[in-house]
Amino acid sequence: MPSIKVRENEPFDIALRRFRRTCDRAGVITDVRKKEFYEKPTWVNKRMKAAAVKRTHKEMAKNRVHRKRMY
């Protein structure tokens, strides 16, 4: 769990903002959301495969050469 030291005469809002930023950098929120519900291993594999397919389709679309018709 990330922690911060509140500086002297520091407003609460700024300290809270620094704490949230450190939590975001540490990946606490994404980890909690990922572990909020149990996900079966088959669902994890299915999600990973779908992400890989999406990634390859995106790379192929990026590298595709658009040819103009000459007629």
Curated annotation (Swiss-Prot):
Coiled coil: none annotated. It comes from the Bacteria. GO terms for cellular component: ribonucleoprotein complex; ribosome. One of its GO terms (biological process) is translation. NCBIfam families: S21p. HAMAP family: Ribosomal_bS21. Belongs to the bacterial ribosomal protein bS21 family. This is Small ribosomal subunit protein bS21.
